[in-house]
């Protein structure tokens, strides 16, 4: 399906918002930019718009290529495009880079209008609520009163849930994939270790490393390597690499010997080349802070009591970072609140990263659900 169809060459757009944005922590961004990409056409009724919310290291480039020479397509190209589960022949699809990101939206790499210098570590902490608030401003800009669906995996799924809670009248369907209604203690611990790798890098320079012409590459590399391990399933990792060595025998040293070591270092190096350390810190804290039930006496059922959206919730059998049990919490709360919810647990060997992959059962389920979303657009 995905190999024969594509949205083709796409061009990002930077949307300026000359308005203040008051953040959850009480600070204010005097203005902000959001980098977006759109695919498909908004219909005359403006009721076929789908918002794609990205995970920790994602961005606005969801599908297609920026040029014919690009080696890689967007991060969810197998999901979004003509004839794909989120069909751009039927839906107007919007992808964006969230506030605090490093791919064109306002973030640590942006110029602070009050100082004329890069924000760096001075960019304020942002939360999932803040992202959804900025995304609502984007919807207003695009003339979209209500999303046909808000879709996201992992941290993106948290945004889809928050949309349904914060703006119940503006979301008809929420697709929450490989996500959770809040992070587990273990996940918070993983994030802290990753941040410590960055914060203690001698080249971090209190977050103003660019003004010192340095990059905390070692810390960011280690953070990514550790994070990447948690996105994979143990059995899948074992089948892919086993105990395979890069040479014929042990070297009895600390150089790269096992193939899995080589793979992780490659992933770390690649990440350092495309991502910003301050953004990584911000994104992981947004994950930690997400807990919509906290505003409702720690009751998730009360948190979703006023949602109007219908829900599609998906988890993956070997995802131990966002285990199926975490999706069950959301499903049970929605049922207790008498909301519409469809749930699927996909058997997969790929751990948390399965939400990015082209599993047949997973793709069929999303396709079937999006067919219903399309029918709602035609009522």
Swiss-Prot record:
It is an enzyme of class 2 (transferase). Pathway: Amino-acid biosynthesis; L-methionine biosynthesis via de novo pathway; O-succinyl-L-homoserine from L-homoserine: step 1/1. The gene is metXS. Signal peptide: none annotated. Substrate binds at residues 224, 353. The record marks 321 as: Important for acyl-CoA specificity. It is found in: Cytoplasm. One of its GO terms (cellular component) is cytoplasm. The keyword tRNA processing does not apply. It comes from Neisseria gonorrhoeae. This is Homoserine O-succinyltransferase. It catalyses: L-homoserine + succinyl-CoA = O-succinyl-L-homoserine + CoA. Belongs to the AB hydrolase superfamily. MetX family. Transfers a succinyl group from succinyl-CoA to L-homoserine, forming succinyl-L-homoserine. Its EC number is 2.3.1.46.
